[in-house]
């Protein structure tokens, strides 16, 4: 008994020990080491054994092997043990520069690459969206695109002498502001906590109080109610409260969602005033980070449009900036000019998609409706839509353009100032 107790005590002490930079806890909850990544893999041994014996593989064998491989691909980290490396961040780092340089060789190659690239990204989006899984592919593509375009602007466009120091500084400030707002957007979107089960909606409803009303005497209202009426009223309120709680109850997070909150199946959490899950930031957009998300879009679009104008003015000096994308003779004469022109086209495609996203966001905020509420209302046919579904008005929370924008800009402050003591 003493030996058993000592062994259990030693195991508990081992678990409580801090992981070194090369250690980690695997998917089975066991302590492992990066150096042992090629050791003791029963799933891989079973697959190889069946292959050599020419026996049929189990249906789940390959998925188990891939799970083990992805779990063991880690990099040493200074604190918290070795970190898992998501391989989905690698393709953008390799394919984006290769495809852009390939497209710069000839006009037809540019058309082929710039047409196929958005199609491949959309295919991968629908593929991952159907599986409801998280991926760093889109965040990696967004960050690397921003960094790589800035690198080419500094290394290829600026040395040509057509861009001044002030213009370079303006682009640098725009990139910095975009990254700062993106970092802030990546924080907590407003996750519904266990102590927020009774949080009410931040939407304020206004009603006029009659000046001359016989039921109001000096601010006091006389109400007469019999015992039977009180019992009936209490039962009715209890049934309504129970029905509301059942409707807003999240069986996954085990919390009662406040009004306008929603559950994200990708992140696996409930978010206050959930708008949508944005794959480009690998995070939800909710009450706490919606304003910073909008600022990120604005800063990026302003920087991108300004940078595209500077690039086209440099590589197509004889053409108008508005028409240079469609007609720029002699741009493929020099490889450097062709590469800058190709990158300008790539940025224009990305900018066009984000302009559409910004337009949808502005319209939804003006009508005080989230993207999630708009989709649900269109599916249930409970909203008015216009402009081919671009404008969706549910008529539930809208209180006018100015009030809707005021509520949107201040909803993050209400979330920070709220506490369990002032919630009723």
Which residues does each PLM region occupy?
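Hydrophobic alpha-helical transmembrane segments that serve as membrane anchors
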Residues: 2-211, 287-424
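Eukaryotic intrinsically disordered and solvent-exposed regulatory patches
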Residues: 169, 235-237, 250, 265, ...
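Long, low-complexity intrinsically disordered regulatory regions
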Residues: 209-230
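Short Cys/His-rich Zn2+-coordinating modules
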Residues: 227-237, 245-251
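Short, flexible, mixed-charge glycine/proline-rich loop motifs
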Residues: 237-245, 254-258, 270
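Short cysteine-rich clusters marking metal-coordination/redox-active sites
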Residues: 250-253, 264-267, 278
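Short, non-ligating residues that shape and space the ligands of small metal-coordination modules
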Residues: 259-262, 273-276, 287
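Interfacial segments of multi-pass membrane proteins
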Residues: 283-284
């Amino acid at each position: 008994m003493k030996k058993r107790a000592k062994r259990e005590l030693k195991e508990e002490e081992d678990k409580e020990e801090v992981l070194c930079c090369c250690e980690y806890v695997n998917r089975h909850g066991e302590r492992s080491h990066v150096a042992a990544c090629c050791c003791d893999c029963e799933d891989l041994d079973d697959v190889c054994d069946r292959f050599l014996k020419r026996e049929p593989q189990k249906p789940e064998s390959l998925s188990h092997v891939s799970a083990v491989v992805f779990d063991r691909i880690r990099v040493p980290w200074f604190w918290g043990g070795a970190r898992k490396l998501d391989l989905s961040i690698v393709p953008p780092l390799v394919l984006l520069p290769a495809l852009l340089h390939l497209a710069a060789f000839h006009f037809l190659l540019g058309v082929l690459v710039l047409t196929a690239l958005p199609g491949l990204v959309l295919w991968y989006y629908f593929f991952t969206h159907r599986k409801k899984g998280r991926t760093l592919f889109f965040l990696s593509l967004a960050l690397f695109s921003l960094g790589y375009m800035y690198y080419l602007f500094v290394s290829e466009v600026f040395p040509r002498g057509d861009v001044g120091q002030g213009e370079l500084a303006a682009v640098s400030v725009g990139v910095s502001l975009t990254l700062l707002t993106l970092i802030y957007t990546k924080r907590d979107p407003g996750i519904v906590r266990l102590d927020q089960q009774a949080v009410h909606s931040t939407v304020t409803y206004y009603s006029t109080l009659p000046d001359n009303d016989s039921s109001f005497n000096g601010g006091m209202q006389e109400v007469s109610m019999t015992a039977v009426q009180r019992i009936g009223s209490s039962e009715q309120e209890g049934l309504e409260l129970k029905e509301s709680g059942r409707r807003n109850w999240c069986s996954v997070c085990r919390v009662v969602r406040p009004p306008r909150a929603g559950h994200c199946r990708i992140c696996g959490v409930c978010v206050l005033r959930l708008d949508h899950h944005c794959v480009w930031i690998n995070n939800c957009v909710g009450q706490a980070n919606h304003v910073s998300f909008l600022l990120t879009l604005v800063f990026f679009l302003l920087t991108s449009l300004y940078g595209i104008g500077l690039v086209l003015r440099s590589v197509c000096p004889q053409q108008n900036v508005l028409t240079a994308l469609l007609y720029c003779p002699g741009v493929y004469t020099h490889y450097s000019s062709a590469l800058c022109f190709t990158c300008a086209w790539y940025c224009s495609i990305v900018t066009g998609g984000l302009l559409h996203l910004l337009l949808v966001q502005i319209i939804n905020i003006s009508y005080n409706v989230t993207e999630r509420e708009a989709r649900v209302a269109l599916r249930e046919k409970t909203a008015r839509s216009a402009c081919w579904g671009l404008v969706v008005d549910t008529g539930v929370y809208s209180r006018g353009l100015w009030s809707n924008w005021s509520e949107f800009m201040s909803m993050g402050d209400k979330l920070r100032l709220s506490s369990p003591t002032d919630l009723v």
